[in-house]
Amino acid sequence: MKNKTNLGLSVFFFFICLVSVTSDLEADRRALIALRDGVHGRPLLWNLTAPPCTWGGVQCESGRVTALRLPGVGLSGPLPIAIGNLTKLETLSFRFNALNGPLPPDFANLTLLRYLYLQGNAFSGEIPSFLFTLPNIIRINLAQNNFLGRIPDNVNSATRLATLYLQDNQLTGPIPEIKIKLQQFNVSSNQLNGSIPDPLSGMPKTAFLGNLLCGKPLDACPVNGTGNGTVTPGGKGKSDKLSAGAIVGIVIGCFVLLLVLFLIVFCLCRKKKKEQVVQSRSIEAAPVPTSSAAVAKESNGPPAVVANGASENGVSKNPAAVSKDLTFFVKSFGEFDLDGLLKASAEVLGKGTFGSSYKASFDHGLVVAVKRLRDVVVPEKEFREKLQVLGSISHANLVTLIAYYFSRDEKLVVFEYMSRGSLSALLHGNKGSGRSPLNWETRANIALGAARAISYLHSRDATTSHGNIKSSNILLSESFEAKVSDYCLAPMISPTSTPNRIDGYRAPEVTDARKISQKADVYSFGVLILELLTGKSPTHQQLHEEGVDLPRWVSSITEQQSPSDVFDPELTRYQSDSNENMIRLLNIGISCTTQYPDSRPTMPEVTRLIEEVSRSPASPGPLSD
């Protein structure tokens, strides 16, 4: 009898637990449906007749929703009040959508939340302080949004917080005194000011660029009476009021100072006018030289560096007419100055996403490449800070940055010159009888070299991305060694200047060319691999060749036919013995171009996989290390 009673109680409690779990999962289901119905943009294709744990992006444990990952799926509009009902949620990711408005207040109910990824949206308003009261939060990424106001003072309440990314917003004020031990931190490209707190002085310099900040790891703060390197607004002294006599004295002093300045300017103008009269009289008797710079300026042609020492927008070769000279990072390529660079004979190499490129040849034999940046949207201080970071980057498969020049009208970047030009020109250029096709070994070497360069960039910092990976930015040396160019320039350029021809490489979640990510780089690199193997251009128009949606085209062919059918005929005509390795590299490219960012491999993983392909016995030879 006793055993029957125990059995009955066990069954009773089992059904109680089952009903409880079912009701909790039903509450989660209602919250997810409210989210689906409340957001705009691309609809979430969830099968409402199936259990919510089977829906795309939803992950469950013990019958409850513990993770919701919907990165780059085209959601837009404000988030509804719904997610706070997912009380067992540990991971929430809405990365790289077009969501806007403030964060819903019911986020405060997510007491088990550990990872929050909201970067790459258009969320606005102040960063809610309740995010830092979540007891289990470990990682917060709010980068690349439109958040305003100050960083909440209660950051230290999040005692388990290890990562805080707030870059590329519109935050103002000082950084609060953060005492918790953060492993990753970034507030670059905001409007913050003041001194950097000592506990953050060990963070990389790039974490603070694009603000009015001072102190380690940036330049030291100016010494003043406030003790923190900044002028404290509203600071109280013994008296904030000035006497009437002091005010009168200040007014008289200002008047006298203005009068003196006026007299100085007046005298200088008269002197300059006399000099111009004398100069004009002497010039009247001399022949008038023809200025190719002036002709170029009137023709409204594409920007160029012209050989007589002026750029096409009229920048003079006269050293007195330029504000500053070149800033060098390496001088092993040879000595030259701005005047010499502008006098060098120039040849147009091409017009890219960020500006036009030229081959500059000096009389003494030195040859360099010059990129003339257009639509730079960052101020001079931030431009110089970012270029200093780029100048410190060195890798065998990255084009070396030699020097740069900044003025109001000109932004020039000088790189090493690569004699064989770009991969794009070799793949899609003249295919006449005199052209030597790229064989499998050369293409595999190019893929590996480019992968190593991008992997190196990603290893420097979790927020460092190339941002503009395409075949025209893969340059080749005389020995066909691949070197990647145009790295890390995207955040400085206006997104309106990025043409449609890069769309074929752009990841589906990227809506703003300046808001890039490492996973988006992986997608672009995957397209590059497919381009190498198929010989087809992914851009809308490339050297008069019609472009295709490469990932979709490759997917459609491989689903219906043999994978070998996608390969460039020039690649398979003479090297059928390498077919197995080509298919392996093709699969790497396909995995990189998966629609969902979280499903893509990292660049170190991609590099390792390509290295394994190179070591395969079927390969024509080991790829260079």
Curated annotation (Swiss-Prot):
Residue numbers binding ATP: L349, G350, K351, G352, T353, F354, G355, S356, S357, K371
LRR repeats: 88-111, 112-134, 136-158, 160-182, 183-204
Pfam families named in the record: LRR_1, LRRNT_2, PK_Tyr_Ser-Thr
Keyword GTP-binding: no
Gene3D superfamilies per UniProt: Phosphorylase Kinase, domain 1 (3.30.200.20), Ribonuclease Inhibitor (3.80.10.10), Transferase(Phosphotransferase) domain 1 (1.10.510.10)
Leader sequence residues: 1-23
Phosphoserine modification, residue list: S345, S422, S517, S619, S624
Superkingdom of source: Eukaryota
GO biological process, one term: response to symbiotic fungus
Protein location: Cell membrane
Membrane-spanning ranges: 246-266
Domain Protein kinase: from-to ranges: 343-613
Induction description: Transiently up-regulated by the endophytic fungus Piriformospora indica.
Keywords: ATP-binding, Cell membrane, Leucine-rich repeat, Membrane, Nucleotide-binding, Phosphoprotein, Receptor, Repeat, Signal, Transmembrane, Transmembrane helix
Free-text comment about domains: The protein kinase domain is predicted to be catalytically inactive.
Something else known: Induction of At5g16590 is not observed in mutants devoid of PII-2, another leucine-rich repeat protein normally associated with the plasma membrane microdomains.
Protein name, as recorded: Probable inactive receptor kinase At5g16590
